[in-house]
């Protein structure tokens, strides 16, 4: 039996990347569940681990893009082959931030702010826009090694210059859909979660690593590759350790050197930045990016190493399936959390609203939702091998979505027509509903004050969980003059 760990047989399959992507997707479920339900303060160590999910996912995307784009005969994979998938993922990305999947949510239950949320840059948008840039770069260069070096330099440059694009006021002249690509400064109530500066750097570094892997493990030299898989893994861990140490050494002082000066308005600035801006930029600097990238490399190397020793563990095959069905798991777990469990009717009925659980309750949610997604990924992976059945299920799913689009959420509209005081979004019909009830119109149609909200709540017999009620009242108080 051939030892694929130590042999030098050329290979285009890097298992540690699949394992890393699968693990990142599973931890992502924990991140969202914890942020939604845990009532306490998330420990710093868990916050740090959670902060490695997106860098891992983005790096893997760049790595896979290089291997799939540059063929063994030095040709490039046709862009027409990948464009439909890129388009589908981008469509899913924007639909996840759309006002909803029902006609009522796009019409009577829509608000200007809900439409602005459509342009929020999340991780899927970041992945696709980054890959489109790298695809264009690959087709301009058309040489894998030069592409790899260029991606490396580009990644360093993006991370280096990112803080300068996060200065307050930058990009105010840009339209909302474009501005979020550059920084995460809030604009008209919309904050980009994964702007290209600095998150594109992780995809670029992944592409550079993919070029190195192809050169060392895919290219044939005297009937074998330059390196074995084990050599590549050891180098990966070593590089990860070095850049992690450098990031640790530099991150606390990277932007904090120089002389503080006071401007004409009495605001202290260091190299043009205020203290608040410097604290906000802590995770947007080159050392911070390199620190997290180092951890990603080391974790990936560790997964590859244990996979070589315990290859038969079912956990690895499960992670591989999750990696292959990562888009399904990403969308499904968001719909379970935000579309079902946090749906007002469900959360009010169960008491499972925001910040409503202790450690054990949160853990139960995490385990159950991960379990559901693992089963769904495994089943869909099997179904994909049966094209006719897959197409039939896709047609049935689209039919259900169409019915939901036509009939969904009209009951919500009718509910707020009768009780506009309980609305927490400024729907355009609320003031007309208030006038019909003999109430004084307000600037946005919502409750005049907390007392009015509570009075209608008692009249309707509504009982909200404490955390949910607190959040609704904060919205009412926050908009009062």
Write out the residue ranges for each language-model feature.
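Alpha-helical transmembrane segments and their immediate juxtamembrane cytosolic regions
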Residues: 2-481
């Amino acid at each position: 039996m051939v030892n694929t760990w130590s042999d030098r047989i050329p290979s285009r399959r890097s298992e540690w990347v699949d394992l890393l992507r699968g693990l990142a997707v599973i931890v992502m479920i924990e991140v969202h569940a914890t942020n939604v339900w845990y009532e306490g303060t998330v420990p710093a160590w868990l916050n740090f681990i959670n902060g490695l999910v997106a860098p891992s996912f983005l790096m893997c995307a760049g790595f896979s893009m290089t291997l799939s784009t540059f063929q063994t005969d030095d040709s490039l994979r046709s862009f027409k082959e990948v464009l439909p998938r890129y388009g589908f993922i981008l469509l899913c990305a924007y639909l996840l931030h759309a006002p909803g999947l029902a006609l009522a949510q796009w019409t009577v239950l829509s608000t200007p702010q809900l439409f602005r949320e459509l342009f929020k840059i999340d991780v899927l948008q970041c992945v696709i826009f980054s890959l489109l840039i790298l695809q264009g770069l690959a087709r301009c260069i058309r040489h894998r090694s030069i592409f790899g070096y260029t991606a490396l330099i580009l990644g360093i440059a993006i991370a280096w210059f990112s803080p300068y694009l996060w200065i307050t006021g930058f990009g105010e002249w840009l339209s909302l859909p474009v501005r979020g690509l550059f920084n995460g400064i809030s604009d008209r109530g919309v904050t980009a979660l994964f702007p290209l500066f600095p998150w594109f750097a992780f995809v670029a570094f992944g592409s550079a690593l993919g070029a190195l892997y192809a050169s060392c493990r895919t290219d044939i030299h005297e009937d074998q590759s330059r390196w074995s898989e084990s050599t590549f893994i050891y180098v990966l861990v070593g590089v990860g350790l070095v850049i992690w140490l450098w990031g640790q050494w530099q991150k606390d002082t990277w932007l904090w050197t120089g002389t503080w000066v006071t401007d004409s308005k009495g605001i202290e600035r260091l190299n043009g930045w205020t203290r608040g801006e410097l604290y906000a930029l802590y995770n947007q600097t080159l050392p911070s990016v390199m620190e997290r990238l180092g951890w990603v490399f080391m974790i990936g190397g560790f997964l590859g190493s244990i996979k070589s020793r315990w290859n038969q563990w079912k956990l690895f095959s499960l992670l591989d399936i999750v990696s292959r069905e990562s888009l399904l798991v990403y969308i499904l777990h968001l719909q379970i959390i935000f579309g079902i469990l946090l749906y007002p009717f469900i959360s009010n009925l169960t008491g499972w609203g925001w910040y409503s659980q202790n450690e054990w309750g949160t853990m139960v949610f995490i385990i159950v939702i991960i379990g559901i997604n693992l089963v769904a990924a495994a089943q869909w992976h099997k179904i994909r091998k049966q094209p006719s059945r897959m197409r039939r299920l896709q047609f049935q799913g689209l039919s259900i979505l169409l019915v939901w689009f036509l009939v969904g959420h009209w009951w919500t509209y009718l509910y707020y027509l009768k009780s506009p005081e309980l609305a927490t979004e400024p729907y355009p019909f609320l003031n007309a509903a208030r006038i019909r009830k003999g109430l004084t119109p307000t600037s946005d149609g919502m409750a005049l004050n907390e007392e009015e909200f509570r009075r209608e709540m008692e009249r309707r017999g509504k009982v909200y969980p404490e955390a949910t009620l607190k959040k609704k009242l904060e919205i009412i108080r926050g908009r009062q003059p």
